[in-house]
Amino acid sequence: MAARPLSRMLRRLLRSSARSCSSGAPVTQPCPGESARAASEEVSRRRQFLREHAAPFSAFLTDSFGRQHSYLRISLTEKCNLRCQYCMPEEGVPLTPKANLLTTEEILTLARLFVKEGIDKIRLTGGEPLIRPDVVDIVAQLQRLEGLRTIGVTTNGINLARLLPQLQKAGLSAINISLDTLVPAKFEFIVRRKGFHKVMEGIHKAIELGYNPVKVNCVVMRGLNEDELLDFAALTEGLPLDVRFIEYMPFDGNKWNFKKMVSYKEMLDTVRQQWPELEKVPEEESSTAKAFKIPGFQGQISFITSMSEHFCGTCNRLRITADGNLKVCLFGNSEVSLRDHLRAGASEQELLRIIGAAVGRKKRQHAGMFSISQMKNRPMILIELFLMFPNSPPANPSIFSWDPLHVQGLRPRMSFSSQVATLWKGCRVPQTPPLAQQRLGSGSFQRHYTSRADSDANSKCLSPGSWASAAPSGPQLTSEQLTHVDSEGRAAMVDVGRKPDTERVAVASAVVLLGPVAFKLVQQNQLKKGDALVVAQLAGVQAAKVTSQLIPLCHHVALSHIQVQLELDSTRHAVKIQASCRARGPTGVEMEALTSAAVAALTLYDMCKAVSRDIVLEEIKLISKTGGQRGDFHRA
């Protein structure tokens, strides 16, 4: 790293005009042509010198796949003056206490450290960064950092027209403005606030002050604003805009589902039908956008394809959240608290080692669209506050002690039981459990970091819950006659038309013995096929819904709730699966629960079979069943 200060010193020397002291020699004024030629040659010599003496890129900001991270996004605040539907819940989000947020000095200290290591672009984000009172001062301080080429801001535009002259004077060089509709009434519906005309005023102020291009970010959502694609594209005819159409992405609290997403190819086809002459524009290195231009238009359009065609291979971005956590991937849920280490007095080298370790753990690419949609992540406004809440509270809270701040195991990933809440009808989202209310107080999240080993280090709980109670309940009525066979021994479907509707609940389980090699790959999420646990969990949910199509004499049941939980057992190198189903009707749901557990187990086998064929599926069994004429059943 010693080479870097030397290189920067050489750059400073070469930037300065050549000066010399004369002891009486006459001064010769070159002609204009010679001056221009000499200046051009001098620039060429400087560039050649810098190429030959360039400092190596920081090892701390280079991941294991050789990606050099030169772009840092810093969240200045969690607060926002809008409530965009795709970004945060309508009621807002619990905010981190002010004492736990980065101070201005801490922001600048971290920025200075990252720039020293090779970051040359910083973008200020939020929340809404322009509601932070000292945002102009922060930009001015960043502008003084040698080596920082670009200071950008992503804003909703509400305060932009008022602040932009000051921000430009302070050193702001790039602007992204979020705008998802050109219809004022629809704007108010999407963001749940007024302000459309303020945003448009901000866009025109940016153009007036000479920003080119002014980037406009538009999240495209089916049934909401996909019909405005052509209107947005038409804006680029007379304005120096880069309208960036962003695929709708899943973040906690935005009720994401696949049906809302409009893919890049679909958007591109729509624009091409109107402007067949649309041309592809060469992309900059590490660009996230696929850029196109309509001949004769002043601006251009771009597509950010986070969901359908990821750009992980060229990712050069790191993020620091408002509470000081380093996040190496937008779609990841792991983070490192730089704030805590900074306040504990960590030296610059210690901070660099922490940063380097986090960057080194960055994966080759994020999970696919299907897996991302299930991941527990911060609401977009926070990026990301990670607490695992169950999908529904237990009928008997005393069955287990549930602590939302205690994360078990070695691979903190997500609350599997809550992932399907946005995809499958009937899943219930609970109120905050009493214990969480006690821990969190009124309106603020607390986070718990610990390096201690879990009291049960052999298990990894992916979703809070307990395995079925062993106590029998109710009379055990049995039949000595098979209900699906008639008097002549032929298959027959039971007539349930006259049976009363009652609440039916069934829980089934299965165990998959993976072996040490496959188990390790599943635990570390390193299978080439993807996240085996997520795929198996969703397969179990889907299987429960189609049980009547798989089991010939099984009735179709309108399930009101499906929950699939997976737990890693390192002592047996196994995955334990528990599936529960609920419905109100004339027939039970034990077949749905059993099918769910079995198919989840089969899916795990399929995901891991390339690694080992010595995988055993066992203990597929009914754990409990309630409701119905024959009484309740709980396996002893």
Swiss-Prot record:
Low complexity composition bias: residue spans: 463-475
Positions of modified residues (N6-acetyllysine): 198, 528
Cofactor comment: Binds 2 [4Fe-4S] clusters. Binds 1 [4Fe-4S] cluster coordinated with 3 cysteines and an exchangeable S-adenosyl-L-methionine and 1 [4Fe-4S] cluster coordinated with 3 cysteines and the GTP-derived substrate.
Region (Disordered): 456-480
Domain (Radical SAM core): residue spans on this chain: 64-277
Residues where S-adenosyl-L-methionine binds: 86, 127, 178, 249
Tissue and organ distribution: Isoform MOCS1A and isoform 2 are widely expressed.
Function: Isoform MOCS1A and isoform MOCS1B probably form a complex that catalyzes the conversion of 5'-GTP to cyclic pyranopterin monophosphate (cPMP). MOCS1A catalyzes the cyclization of GTP to (8S)-3',8-cyclo-7,8-dihydroguanosine 5'-triphosphate and MOCS1B catalyzes the subsequent conversion of (8S)-3',8-cyclo-7,8-dihydroguanosine 5'-triphosphate to cPMP.
Additional information: The MOCS1 locus has initially been reported to produce MOCS1A and MOCS1B from non-overlapping reading frames within a bicistronic transcript. However, only isoform MOCS1A seems to be translated from the bicistronic transcript. Isoform MOCS1B seems to be translated from a monocistronic mRNA that is derived by alternative splicing.
Subunit and partners: Isoform MOCS1A and isoform MOCS1B probably form a heterooligomer.
Protein name as annotated: Molybdenum cofactor biosynthesis protein 1
Organism: Homo sapiens (Human)
